[in-house]
Amino acid sequence: ALEVFELTGKPLSRHFDEQQTTPPPLDLHTIALIPENRALLHARIAERFGQMLRQGFLDEMAALRRKYPALTAGYTSMRCVGYRQAWDYIESGYGYETFVEKGTAATRQLAKRQLTWLRKIPLAQSLDPFAAQNYLQTASESVKHHFGI
């Protein structure tokens, strides 16, 4: 950014603002699964995080730390949701319930960011994965209709 400013006298952000935006040359038909029931989403996240723990997630973390002694919390792989909280739990020694709460909360926050991103892009259709409808069939029919298949 400093180099661009030095060479052109304009901040990098202005260069980005001045760029022409052209639509992609593809005929996109975007479909997203967006749950309407936030409480159900949170319950599913908690259920899935618990399942990961029962299937040995903390053992996996311990094995990684043994296999790669140079591994630190600063590595990108250890900053991912779940791994970061597991690392903190192992290092700090706070209670297991606190770890579960922090891991579940971090996963909910990630889901919220993903849903915010999805709502900002133009969607041909959004489907609720928790609704009684068969969303795979609905999505398939939508794609077939869009592309005239």
Segments and roles (model prediction):
Residues P23-I149:
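Catalytic core of IPPT-family isopentenyl/dimethylallyl transferases
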